[in-house]
Amino acid sequence: MVQQRTNETPASKRASTIDPVDVAQFSALSEHWWDEAGPFAPLHRFTPVRMGFIRDCLQDLPRAPATEVDRSRPLAGLRVLDIGCGGGLLSEPMTRLGADVVGVDASGENIEAACAHADGVGLSIDYRHTSAETLAEASEQFDAVVASEVIEHVADLDAFTAALSDLLRPGGGLLTTTLNRTLRSLILGKFAAE
């Protein structure tokens, strides 16, 4: 779902949104992010579907009038935050579609894996080991914020969504995706896929 930001809320000091147990679990798997047959194989298979949805949702967001957008780079001129980027499975394709991507993750190991892979394929992505609330407190702003398969790992949902709102420029788009709230989705998505 993409939401347009219509008001400006000043960043404020927030409780941590980071769940240390989840961070430890993903950190332990960080060397496997780009192994298409490894523990993140379901995410690799799902990425083309997610990217089609992300492209369709973000490509019509407002951007600088001088930005030339062609079909191969429909996200050109957009500064996009990929919050909870993991190993960069969405950051890389968004960059290839023309976005200026900042990928953020609470796991330093995930950021190291993302940086190594991006360097290996010649992509320039600004990866950071930080949190949404820290970026909001620093008054960072983005045309779009993508939080895909992240909110189920957040310790304080209210603080997280407030931080995401603060990170959006006026008229920006917030896109969040998560699993259905069913037992089957929980088992297949959170435990089997991640």
Q: Where is each model-derived feature located?
A:
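N-terminal alpha-helical modules
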Residues: 3-13, 60, 64, 68, ...
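N-terminal, positively charged/glycine-rich alpha-helical extensions of SAM-dependent methyltransferases
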Residues: 2-40, 44, 48
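A C-terminal cap/extension of S-adenosyl-L-methionine-dependent methyltransferases
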Residues: 40-43, 121, 194
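Conserved Class I S-adenosyl-L-methionine
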Residues: 188-194
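Conserved alpha-helix/loop element of class I SAM-dependent methyltransferases that forms part
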Residues: 45-76
